[in-house]
């Protein structure tokens, strides 16, 4: 006899919870084993222990001489200097010098662009450079990183998670050839049930369906039974970087934090929202969940489709057709320029997303508005914000009124004092969690995507997003940001100075270790 649907979901949640407990126990066991090994070496093998201390000291110099952010260097330096052997072993296990070795990703080239496409992008860059030299420089830089600049693309900014996800599902209903999805979190719930209904119908019509999600992000939310159901209806599923396969993966860095949906090559989505009920405010978590996203139609969709294909094939997946089959088949009407980008730890020390943020902030002459749920930035980003505000640019940072990670928000607060001193205006979204990740500069250039203003997004996770230059969607983004500030409380210097003592103490103590939060 078939079990009731509610009972099945309850059993799945229990199974997922047990898996998380197992991973937590293994992680604690790993740390305990390192501590025991440290104690044994210190007591019984003094010479070996001393040699490891010297090696640890050498690693401190090595870490600080390599390219990378100061926050990353400071965190590891403090840990290794405080407990040299423990810190050294954890560095070997959890970080290493080559993040790509922590991932089972094949070394493959990205799907290649034709010379005609590369030349078209260069011509568009020159056109943008003539109209807006500062944004032309940014577009040229990203073009050299392999992210072409496009016209012939429509862009629609979707100002809430509800609008974003509803629009996405409506377009999936119209799919005729393929649906590709890559998300950090996929979770059972009402939204998932709607998506599964679409998948069943489309799989029955012969539509190619591929789903890729991050194991850590979805661990408690997407049980194995749901994955098997996906496969039974004909969808292909890959799970990014399973945390339980190897001891050195019992960690939450090097995750796939992207949000990508590609439909028939001509439509693509990215933004801040994942596939879970709270993002559409079907269920309430942390008050009102304010998210956003963007829909692209036309030529620029190829970059997001290409990045999905690249990740899929590096994880060992295969396609039913050649790469060119998945390219856009139409050109959409749209003003301005569109430039989707992607980023990941395997490209370090180059960070396309962080560099784009720095140039958006540094290139602005009048205003820079930013939304982000987190703030854990390097000295270069903090300096860019302070210099922009100090030179008369209207810099505004919008953050949650109800944060989802309290310790992470204490770290964010630790930056407020310096930013306020230089004239940065900070707003906290009173109704709840502001989860969107956007930047708007001078109403001329903007970013919408998955990238938080923190070290993990800039250096440790796989991310994506879209740059807009002179596109009408930026006016919708500006209206949304104005609406956010109307519902927000501006943080004053007095507010910051009188924050709870626990926030002041923990914010300062945890700040060097933000890469682990």
Model-derived regions, located:
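N-terminal localization/anchoring segments of enzymes in phospholipid and broader phosphate metabolism
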Residues: 1-355, 359, 363, 403, ...
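Helical hairpin unit composed of two closely spaced alpha helices linked by a short loop
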Residues: 359, 364, 374-395, 400, ...
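C-terminal structural cap/anchor segments
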Residues: 393-397, 401-453
